[in-house]
UniProtKB/Swiss-Prot annotation:
Lineage: Eukaryota, Metazoa, Ecdysozoa, Arthropoda, Hexapoda
Compositionally biased intervals (Polar residues): 27-39, 65-80, 196-218
Keyword Membrane: yes
Name of the protein described by the UniProt record: Protein Star
Keywords, in A-Z order: Cell membrane, Developmental protein, Endoplasmic reticulum, Golgi apparatus, Membrane, Sensory transduction, Signal-anchor, Transmembrane, Transmembrane helix, Vision
InterPro entries named in the record: EGF_Rcpt_Signaling_Reg, FkbM_mtfrase, SAM-dependent_MTases_sf
Subunit structure of this chain's protein: Interacts with Spitz via the lumenal domain and mediates its transport to the Golgi.
Region listing for Disordered, in residue ranges: 1-85, 111-267
Cytoplasmic topology ranges: 1-279
Biased composition (Gly residues): 247-261
Tissues where this protein is expressed: In the larval eye disk, expression is first seen at the morphogenetic furrow, then in the developing R2, R5, and R8 cells as well as in the posterior clusters of the disk in additional R cells.
């Protein structure tokens, strides 16, 4: 079956309609002709000639004027049309063919399309209701389906009411036809749009068939359907605009451009946008990350502050190891290896050889005699340490290869006599210095003396070791917390005096000098005098020491109980000598005098 196209001009449309009716009457049966004649006589009504022609045109070409594809047999005047070109634009109705003065009613229109019901059903089976080849949004397709269902229901209801007769003339197409600017002129000829533009309007073209059937329904159904069609056309506007832009810009690739336009339409769909919770997800993650980092910093700062407070507490607290005895072998090894072993000075080869041989100046050497005469005469030309050293040498009778142990800290460090005794009498000396600055000074001064040992420690006033903080008032550093200066405090380990003697592997000493700022008596009380042997004990007090007389009296009483006697006082330096040693030395001198002639 070919598609017949009618002109919009009434005269031409009448001629074409008459030719189509003749061919149709020749091929149809007599039964159809009788029924058509009966129905035409039944609906005959007096009307003007002009309106009759228009009515005949409208009745005969109702299928084509309403925008649907009328299928008729091919004829010489109306050649057959290929299947590819079946989609055409709806033929425009000429408003000039209708007389506005005449009163037109739908009941007066002759039914000239009798017998077209079977053809319309056959066309509906061949032509799909909706072409979904082009992507559209879901809500547009759903609205189109609802419209088609409503139109089909209204059309079927109208056919049942008419009893299977033909359709009425398409009067509704005249009422809802396009604007005057789109109406063709009387001399216009039917034209066909290009294939690209036919694809743009496929949605509206395929829906015109259903709309034409819906217009044949009663007027109470026709008006709501027309409003719904206008809304549908408004919703399709954006889709047609994107499709037209794709076809115009892409040419042959109109399908791909239409696909990109549909993708843009999907992006504009509010249902496809991310939910509010998903949009807030990056912000929530950012806040959580910031909170985690901030919490980590707070924990780190608190931990650092706690550690710093613990460190300051450790630096200010004294630890007493009262469970460790002063003659513990582990304690002695610790003191010997840690505090004494790595601080041994390297003497020159000559000094080391002399120390190993034990050679020193003779007792009656002129140098020693000069030193003794100088000290005895009270000449103050020498230093205080040299004067004290000469007096000690006089007390011991100029003994060679003796031993001295001294602990004079702070302001009393200038009274140390061990270096002089080591050089003049080849004595072995042990210097105990707790303050770091004076310790490094003494170590530098005695670096070339092989028999001098400097120990970085303090003498404990108890019989067990301990660790204390030394407050050095003459050393200042910048504070780490504020701009003010703070006193530098150092930590030092204190060992009992007897432990230091055992670490030096010697318990017999010729001289013991103590100047520890008021702790001399406590240190002397820790010594086991039954296990050690000390000839001379010197006590050195500070000038600002309070109650010097009472303190010296207490020391004198304690040493008197240990067989020591105060021999001489030089300033605030007190010298005590063991009585047994002095008596034995006097006895030796008397024996020598008796043997001489």
């Amino acid at each position: 079956m070919s598609q017949q196209v009618f002109s919009a001009h009434p005269a031409l449309a009448v001629d074409q309609l008459q030719q189509a009716e003749q061919e149709e009457h020749n091929t149809s049966s007599n039964h159809h002709q009788q029924r058509s004649a009966t129905q035409s006589r039944r609906h005959t009504k007096a009307a003007p000639k002009k309106f009759t022609l228009s009515r005949s045109c409208a009745g005969g070409g109702s299928g084509t004027l309403s925008g649907v594809h009328q299928q008729v047999k091919p004829s010489p005047s109306n050649p057959a049309i290929s299947p590819e070109c079946r989609k055409t634009l709806p033929v425009r109705t000429n408003y000039a063919a209708v007389d506005d003065d005449d009163d037109i009613e739908c009941e007066d229109v002759d039914e000239v399309n009798f017998g077209q019901q079977e053809k319309e059903r056959e066309r509906e089976t061949r032509q799909p209701t909706k072409d979904c080849g082009t992507d559209e949004t879901d809500h547009v397709q759903q609205r189109h389906k609802n419209t088609m269902t409503t139109s089909a229901t209204a059309a079927s209801r109208h056919h049942h009411q008419d009893g299977g007769g033909g359709d009425q003339s398409d009067l509704s197409s005249v009422i809802s036809s396009p604007s005057v600017s789109t109406v063709s002129s009387p001399l216009s000829t039917p034209t066909r749009l290009p294939q690209a533009l036919q694809q743009q309007l496929h949605c509206c073209q395929k829906s015109t068939g259903m709309e034409s059937r819906a217009r044949t329904s009663p007027q109470q159904i026709q008006h709501p359907h027309r409003q719904h069609h206008q809304q549908q056309h408004h919703h399709h506007h954006h889709h047609h605009h994107l499709t037209a832009a794709g076809c115009t810009g892409g040419g042959g690739g109109g399908g791909g451009s239409g696909g990109s336009g549909s993708c843009k339409a999907k992006k504009l769909d509010p249902r496809l946008n991310p939910s509010p919770y998903r949009q807030l997800l990056p912000i929530a993650l950012c806040l959580l990350s910031f909170a985690a980092v901030f919490a980590t910093l707070i924990v780190y700062m608190d931990t650092t502050e706690i550690r710093h407070q613990q460190f300051r507490l450790n630096m200010s607290r004294d630890y007493e190891l009262n469970g460790v005895a002063q003659d513990d072998p582990a304690l002695i090894d610790f003191l010997r290896q840690i505090h004494m072993g790595k601080y041994l000075g390297k003497a020159s080869p000559k000094v080391a050889a002399a120390a190993s041989v034990g050679v020193g100046p003779p007792p009656n050497s002129p140098r020693l005699a000069a030193a003794g005469s100088t000290f005895g005469s009270g000449n103050s030309s020498g230093s205080g340490a040299d004067q004290l050293a000469h007096y000690v040498a006089d007390l011991v009778g100029g003994k060679m290869n003796g031993a001295v142990i001294q602990s004079l800290s702070g302001p009393l460090a200038h009274l140390i006599t061990a270096p002089w005794l080591s050089e003049q009498l080849n004595w072995m000396g042990v210097l105990v210095e707790p303050e770091p600055r004076w310790y490094f000074t003494l170590r530098k001064q005695n670096a070339q003396r092989a028999r001098m040992q400097v120990v970085h420690a303090c003498v404990s006033p108890n019989t067990y070791p301990k660790e204390i903080t030394i407050h050095n008032e003459d050393v200042r550093i910048n504070s780490l917390h504020d701009e003010e200066t703070s006193w530098f405090n150092s930590r030092v380990k204190c060992f009992p005096l007897y432990t230091i003697m055992l670490a030096c592997e010697r318990t017999e000493y010729d001289l013991l000098s103590l100047g520890v700022q008021g702790h001399e008596l406590e240190i002397l009380q820790t010594l086991p005098f039954d296990k050690v042997k000390i000839d001379v004990i010197s006590i050195h007090l500070l000038e600002d020491h309070e109650d010097v007389a009472d303190y010296v009296l207490d020391i004198t009483r304690f040493l008197a109980g240990k067989s020591y006697k105060l021999q001489r006082k030089i300033g605030r330096n007190y010298f005590y000598q063991r009585l047994n040693a002095s008596a034995s030395r006097t006895r030796k001198k008397d024996i020598l005098l008796l043997k001489t002639p």
